[in-house]
């Protein structure tokens, strides 16, 4: 996975014990996030705002606060983060750019004949997300 490569590039070996897996529902994330409390982690990256909100719900239930006790960064930057305080620092994918790239590829493939489409290699297109800094990270 990309995050594992990024960790290794910075001299950090990924630790599977620190990976928590959850469905993309707040209640599932609430249950899965209990593993965070068993670790010495002080920061969490959640793969969606819903997962981050489940984590926030658990932390608040345990009288822990963001960013005082844990820093939280999520991926989505959806409006869901307005349901909780503090607002989540988030990675935002440009959905317009993503849709344009998908349509461009689809139209290019539709213009090919059937045999060419079957032989076509997968396409990698890198879209640069942006970090939307809000209030859920404690600066060290």
Regions found by a protein language model. Name each.
Residues 1-140:
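Bacterial carbohydrate/catabolite-sensing allosteric modules
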